[in-house]
Design a protein with these regions (language model features):
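Short, flexible coil/linker segments at domain boundaries that flank nucleotide/cofactor-interacting
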Residues: 1-4, 74
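Proline-centered loop/turn at the N-terminus of a beta-strand
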Residues: 6, 76-80
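Conserved acidic carboxylate
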Residues: 10-11
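Two-component/phosphorelay signaling modules centered on CheY-like receiver
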Residues: 14-33
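Acidic, metal-coordinating helix/loop segments flanking the phosphotransfer/catalytic sites
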Residues: 35-52
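Conserved phosphotransfer microenvironments
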Residues: 37, 54-73, 84-87
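Conserved phosphotransfer cores of two-component systems
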Residues: 45-48, 70-76
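Output/docking surface of receiver
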Residues: 80-123
């Protein structure tokens, strides 16, 4: 049996967080699911995670600002931003962005396959 890949999942919407974490745990991922941005930042800095997923679920909520803070923290971790609300401006800090309510688990899993293959380290200036 292959070891599971440790990833972080952050979403302020607890129902969406729970459903997404459940689906990801059925795959080869060891998911740390967090609904608090401070805890997410602490886990990102302290843990040996391979990748992080940040989900913005509701338009106009404060979670969007918190996600921007997490993205700007330069955590040297490949990050996938799933902007289901569609109201975050183009974000240059995320390694990959999926926009819109129609983002499916298939899209997220495909993006994770790409990001988990990347090495941890500083992002390029490009």
């Amino acid at each position: 049996m292959r070891p599971k890949i440790p990833i972080l999942l952050y979403c302020a919407d607890r129902e969406l967080l729970s459903a997404t974490a459940f689906a990801l745990r059925l795959q080869p991922y060891d998911v740390t699911a967090i609904d608090d941005s401070r805890s997410a930042a602490a886990v990102m800095m302290a843990s040996d995670l391979v990748c992080g997923i940040l989900i913005h679920a509701k338009q106009g909520d404060l979670a969007g600002r918190l996600i921007h803070r997490l993205l700007e923290a330069d955590l040297h971790l490949p990050l996938l931003l799933v902007d289901r609300a569609g109201d975050l401006a183009p974000v240059r800090y995320a390694d990959m962005v999926l926009y819109g309510r129609n983002t499916s688990m298939t899209h997220i899993l495909g993006a994770l396959n790409v990001l988990c293959a990347r090495k941890r380290g500083p992002r390029s200036a490009a």
